[in-house]
From Swiss-Prot:
GO term, biological process aspect, one: mitochondrial genome maintenance
Pfam families assigned to the protein according to its UniProt record, in alphabetical order: MMM1
Chain intervals with Polar residues compositional bias: 330-341
Membrane topology: Single-pass type I membrane protein
Species of provenance: Yarrowia lipolytica (strain CLIB 122 / E 150) (Yeast)
Protein name: Maintenance of mitochondrial morphology protein 1-1
Superkingdom to which the source organism belongs: Eukaryota
Keyword Transport: yes
One annotated Gene Ontology cellular component of this protein: endoplasmic reticulum membrane
Listed InterPro entries: Mmm1, MMM1_dom, SMP_LBD
Length: 389
């Protein structure tokens, strides 16, 4: 049996300490490795962000506004040497859209009605009556776009300049009355007919996109015309009913100056028209509170589809027969209960004489009849004389 003795113990009983020490250190190192593996690979905390993910996010989502020089460099566009481009394809697209619009407007009286509603305003001067649109012609020619070129403005932002020209006859005819409010309101009136036609327009259209980086505002498209535009009008007027004043030059100049001022104050640089671009990614908002919040209807129980009475006490109760016997369909049935039924007679107390009120007979249409009282008395006497079981 001595050959099966552990090598750590010598035959003389002396312990081999170097071997035992190495064996214990090996077991301890294996346990330590297993503990580290379980702690940091199996039960590791996943709340800390990954550094590599942050680096990838920083590369995908730039934080600053890309400079115009970088955009021009990556699109191989030089604002100084690049030649103006033709926009014939864009002119064709606009022509198709205008053709569809004109096809819908022609022969549609709703357009004139809509224009009349717009012109019916309380802001009209007191010497003018209601303005009615009597003629509308949106022309048959199409605008031409060309000579497009991208430049830098004074602040360094990019903007596109496009030449626009249109030669057509776009006509709007209206009728109204000039009122004389002295000595009383509408003391006299003079009919006035006016026709305004756009004959020619040419100018330089400027289009710019203003981005709103790192702000809650939406991106905008700014549209304006250069001050060196050309605008030609044809104005026809008629004043009076019997003796008419045709095409007064003073009236034509007055109307044309008003139209030019209106256009300049809204569409000519430095003034502009702006349009917001829709956002591709919108922030999700919290759902609105339920309509029944605070009223007891948001508990998950659906409301009854049937109308509920405002006062529950006003609901009619089922009628009761004399002696406390309810009749289920008494409120809906027109049949009178059979008092001579043996089951009905046996169910009544022997020592109690039923009392039939007048309302019971009123409901059945026999109020105050002697036949009903006679039947009740006969039933009571039969109960008194019948032997008890």
């Amino acid at each position: 049996m001595s050959q099966f003795v552990l090598p750590a113990v010598a035959s003389e009983g002396i312990i081999n300490w170097p071997f035992l020490t190495g064996f214990m250190l090996g077991q301890f190192s294996v346990g330590l490795v297993l503990l580290i593996f379980v702690r940091f690979f199996i039960f590791s905390d996943q709340t800390e962000p990954d550094i590599n993910t942050q680096r990838r996010t920083a590369k995908v989502l730039p934080t600053g506004n890309p400079s115009t020089d970088a955009i021009l460099e990556k699109t191989y566009y030089n604002t100084k040497t690049h030649q103006p481009e033709s926009l014939d394809w864009f002119s064709v697209l606009v022509a198709q859209a205008l053709y569809q619009l004109r096809d819908e407007v022609r022969g549609n009286d709703e357009v004139l009605e809509r224009l009349n509603e717009i012109l019916k305003s309380d802001k009209l001067p007191g010497f003018l009556d209601t303005i009615n649109v009597v003629d509308l012609d949106i022309g048959d020619a199409f605008p031409q776009f060309g000579a497009c070129k991208v430049n830098k403005d004074e602040s360094g932002d990019l903007e596109a300049e496009i030449k626009v020209s249109l030669e057509d006859t776009i006509k709007l005819g209206v009728e109204t009355k000039m009122l004389l409010n002295f000595p009383i309101p509408k003391f006299a009136s003079v009919p006035v007919s006016l026709s305004v036609s756009l004959v020619k327009f040419s100018g330089t259209l400027t289009v710019a996109i203003r981005s709103a980086f790192n702000s809650g505002e939406a991106n905008r498209v700014l549209v304006s015309f250069a001050p060196d535009y050309e605008l030609q009008w044809k104005i026809e007027s008629s004043v009076g009913s019997t003796q008419k004043l045709q095409n007064a030059e003073k009236i034509s100049r007055l109307i044309e100056s008003r139209i030019r001022r209106w256009f300049k104050d809204r569409c000519v640089y430095p003034e502009y028209q702006q349009f917001e671009l829709p956002k591709l990614w919108r922030k999700t908002s919290a759902p609105p509170p339920s309509a029944g919040a605070g009223t007891g209807t948001s508990t998950g129980v659906p409301p009854s589809p049937f109308p509920q009475p405002a006062n529950p006490s006003s609901v009619p109760k089922p009628l009761e027969l004399p002696g406390g016997f309810p009749h289920r369909n008494m409120s809906m049935s027109s049949q009178r209960p059979n008092i001579n039924n043996p089951k009905f007679i046996r169910s009544m107390s022997v020592n109690t004489r039923p009392t039939y009120s007048s309302s019971f007979y009123e409901m059945q249409g026999t109020a105050g009849s002697s036949s009903g009282s006679a039947v009740a008395d006969e039933a009571y006497r039969s109960l008194q004389t019948s032997p008890r079981r």
